[in-house]
């Protein structure tokens, strides 16, 4: 597999380290050269690339996606908070209808998306509570505090780098059905996501406590491995979930 990785932060570097690729291209505006990686000076999708992996930012998703959709590639997107922008979301999916590309949204920092996608037509509401250390939200607080309650769209304006989980859920069931609570807790040294699903099929609750990456406490290693799983599934004859 020949890949183009957008973003050479902690996630991108881990993919290079742990992935099994024939050739790796990378596009990153600030990263230094990495051994074994062909760094692109300007953004493009080389003709030999079969898969594009975005692990940079919601801004990168908005800036490069429409160009990527012109190529016959598998496009894996992790910064799904870009889709909280309704204007961009509508344009993206409009372009995708006639695109030769296929788009994949990994589960990222949570689980249970197989359940959610299976019953999406019957879902009434999804409530997601995210508990984070205040510093990861750019806050300095002394006690546990609810810092936000509301819609995914509203949350994305205040915490654009912390809404990927909620945005992925919104892409599955519809953003209007998702309610977000963000809690800052100084006692926490990791992130917790609690997802509560109410549906005509059943009610479900998932609690995910992620251990931060040693290199970047803001990143969950589960996110890295969910991307690696998505990459493996592209070539595997057996797929679970």
Curated annotation (Swiss-Prot):
Pfam families in the record: Asp_DH_C (PF01958), NAD_binding_3 (PF03447)
Catalyzed reactions per annotation: L-aspartate + NADP(+) + H2O = oxaloacetate + NH4(+) + NADPH + H(+); L-aspartate + NAD(+) + H2O = oxaloacetate + NH4(+) + NADH + H(+)
EC class (word): oxidoreductase
Domain of life (superkingdom): Bacteria
Keyword Oxidoreductase part of the UniProt annotation: yes
Record-listed E.C. numbers: 1.4.1.21
Binding site for NAD(+): 109, 164
An example Gene Ontology biological process: NAD biosynthetic process
Keyword terms: NAD, NADP, Oxidoreductase, Pyridine nucleotide biosynthesis
One GO MF term: aspartate dehydrogenase activity
Functional pathway: Cofactor biosynthesis; NAD(+) biosynthesis; iminoaspartate from L-aspartate (dehydrogenase route): step 1/1
Active site, UniProt feature: 193
Database matches in InterPro entries: Asp/hSer_DH_NAD-bd, Asp_DH, Asp_DH_arc, Asp_DH_prok, L-Asp_DH, NAD(P)-bd_dom_sf
Function: Specifically catalyzes the NAD or NADP-dependent dehydrogenation of L-aspartate to iminoaspartate.
More info: The iminoaspartate product is unstable in aqueous solution and can decompose to oxaloacetate and ammonia.
Family from the record: Belongs to the L-aspartate dehydrogenase family.
Name of the protein in question: L-aspartate dehydrogenase
Organism: Thermotoga sp. (strain RQ2)
């Amino acid at each position: 597999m020949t890949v183009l990785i957008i973003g050479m932060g902690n996630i991108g570097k881990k993919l290079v380290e742990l992935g099994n690729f024939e050739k790796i291209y990378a596009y990153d505006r600030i990263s230094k050269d990495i051994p074994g990686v062909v760094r692109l000076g300007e953004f493009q999708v080389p003709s030999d690339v079969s898969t594009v992996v975005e692990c940079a930012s919601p801004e990168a998703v908005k800036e490069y996606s429409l160009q990527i959709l012109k190529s016959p590639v598998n496009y894996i997107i992790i910064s799904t908070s870009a889709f909280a922008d309704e204007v961009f979301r509508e344009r993206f999916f409009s372009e995708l209808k006639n695109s030769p590309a296929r788009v994949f949204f990994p589960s990222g920092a949570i689980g249970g998306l197989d359940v959610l996608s299976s019953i999406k037509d019957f879902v009434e509401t999804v409530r997601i509570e995210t508990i984070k250390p205040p510093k990861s939200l750019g806050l300095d607080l002394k006690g546990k505090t609810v810092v936000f309650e509301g819609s995914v769209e509203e949350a994305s304006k205040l915490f654009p780098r912390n809404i990927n989980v909620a945005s992925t859920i919104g892409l599955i069931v519809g953003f209007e059905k998702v309610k977000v609570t963000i809690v800052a807790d100084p006692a926490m040294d990791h992130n917790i996501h609690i997802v509560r699903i109410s549906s005509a099929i059943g009610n479900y609750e998932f609690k995910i406590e992620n251990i931060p990456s040693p290199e970047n406490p803001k990143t969950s290693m589960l996110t890295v491995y969910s991307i690696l799983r998505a990459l493996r599934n592209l070539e595997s004859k057996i797929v679970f979930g």
